[in-house]
C-alpha cells in the first residue's frame, strides 16, 4: 500500500522465492585462508538450487509518491525480484481487493517519520475504510500510534509489540 523504498515488498518476494539473504553479495570472509574457496562456491550453488523458481508470488506496492515508486522498482531490480514485484503510483483511496486472497503488510508514514500526527490519523481512517474484512485477505499495519485502532475504526484481531529501528511500534493484524 505504501511501498516507500520497497523494503517490505522486496523482502516478501525474497522470502516467497526462498532466496537466501546475501546470496547476491560477496563477503570479505570469502577471502580468508582458513576456509577453502570451494566451500563458499558449494554453499552458493546449494543456495541457488534452493530458490523456488516456480513460486507463484506476485507482490504489488502502491504509493502516492512517484519517486517512492521509482525507488521501489530500482531496488526490486537490484534484489533480482523485479519479475514478481510491481509498483505503481496510486492513492490509498483507490485500493481494491481484486483477487480471492491477499496479504497487505504496510508501514505507513506516521508523525515521527513523515507526517504530522493529524495527517497520520486521517490516513488511518482512510485505511480502515478501504481495508475491509474479506475472506482470504489479511491486513497487517506497523505503527507507533497507540490510537491507531480508534482511528482505523476496528480493534485488531491480534497485536504484537515490535521496534522499527529505535521506534517502539505495534503490529496490528486483521484477518477475521
Segments from the language model and where they lie:
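Conserved S-adenosyl-L-methionine
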Residues: 1-95, 112-113, 119
